[in-house]
Amino acid sequence: MTKNIHDVAYELQKAIAENEDFKTLKESYAAVQADAASKNLFDEFRTMQLSLQQKMMQGQEITEEDNQQAQEVVARIQQDAKITKLMETEQRLNVVIGDVNKIIMKPLEELYSAQQQA
């Protein structure tokens, strides 16, 4: 009997929510949100990050001033232990999600690589 792919996706969603790295990420995010200075700095970082991504997607040039502002914010973030822990945990979870994505995409990869070899 074939499994419904959406049911499997919901199982995966639940597994991610129960993952220790995700639980730690939630705790780290709550700690950042509870500290006014950390929250403001994190919000500033996210705003800057989204602005730079938007510029790149629109084909606009990232200026030297943009780079300098980004470097200044990153330098301040590296001094904030709460944000640093949040970002490290997010990176670990991103690795897990990337691994899962590779597994999910394997049938397509095999299909297309078999087509190229034929």
Curated annotation (Swiss-Prot):
InterPro entries: Com_YlbF, YheA/YmcA-like_dom_sf
Classification via SUPFAM superfamilies: YheA/YmcA-like
Pfam families for this protein: Com_YlbF
Highest taxon listed in the record's lineage: Bacteria
Signal peptide: none
Membership in a protein family: Belongs to the UPF0342 family.
Stored HAMAP family: UPF0342
Name by which UniProt lists this protein: UPF0342 protein BCG9842_B4422
Naturally occurring in which organism (per UniProt): Bacillus cereus (strain G9842)
Native organism taxonomy: Bacteria, Bacillati, Bacillota, Bacilli, Bacillales
